[in-house]
Amino acid sequence: RAKGLLVGTEAGVEYHQTFRDKGMDRPLPVAFYDPTNPAARDYVWNKLKNNYFDLGVRVFWLDACEPELNPGHPSNLRFYAGKGLNVSNLYPRENARMIWEGMREQGEDEFLTLCRSAWAGQAKYGAAVWSGDIGPTWEALYTQVRAGQSIGIAGIPWWTSDIGGFHGGDASDPAYQELFARWFEFGAFCPLMRVHGHREPREDVASENPGGPNEIWSYGEEVADICSRYILLRETLRPYLTRVMDEASECGIPAMRALFLEFPEDGRCWSWDGEFLLGPDLLVSPITEAGSRTARVYLPRGARWRQLLIAPSRGDEDQEATASYMLGETFEGGSELTIDAPLECIPLFIRENTDLD
């Protein structure tokens, strides 16, 4: 405070927000450091270095880095960089910059920072974004398919969601097990794949109770088997994913792509937003409705597409098999198909002659 490193207000005092953490019997006022101030970034990084980096920590998860001002009145805020109404959206970017500058100063060249918020230009600081504390619902899963495409178009190529949603979800409930399986299948083809959530039975996030179990085996044998197969498939795709991530890093092209980015001449791709491409060649059509066992899929015009099937425990001798997937029938682009989508299968297609190895 005495160094002037905190977010201020037009009245000249620092901004305060009430917050309740574990071990507190009541909410207490907290202030926010001002990441637009280079001296503030240095101050916070030195705290992180002494307490985490020097003990071996190399990956940081930056929660609530908007910051979480409630209520937030940007016009009342004052930053080192200027008036809040003009610069407050820079907060998450400059916060990620704080980590980046500190890590680079320590000689670290390859690292990832996971953030809850982002602003234009943040990706250059090695920052990925997740979509925050979303509900464990089919509606939330539906919106994540669109959110991932939207943030990529906005210039943030590294994105993920909390598989299964964050606030709730009972691992013993068959209805939620279905949702978790479908979300896991979708998550396997997001730029980053991660499970996170505050499952039932749970208490307030400020309590000592971490919530219910949330490992893939917490959801029963069938779901655990499905998740294991998609983890294996994700690992099998590592060479392809590396090429896609390199392109995103070097060119800014998102890993998770709306169809029209690859097929701008196909008018249907501009409105068909329930599918996306992971990189240029892998088409993904997530199931986002409870009980659905078929899917309506559109294959963009200008390419031929071969169905990619998740492998069962033993490969089918009539199909080309790998450890994790099989290649099925080939279809012409411009086709709209209804295909089977049992619980263990997310509709997947690859461009003909694509090398996933």
What does each model-found stretch correspond to?
Residues C269, L356-D357:
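Edge strands and adjacent loops of beta-rich recognition modules
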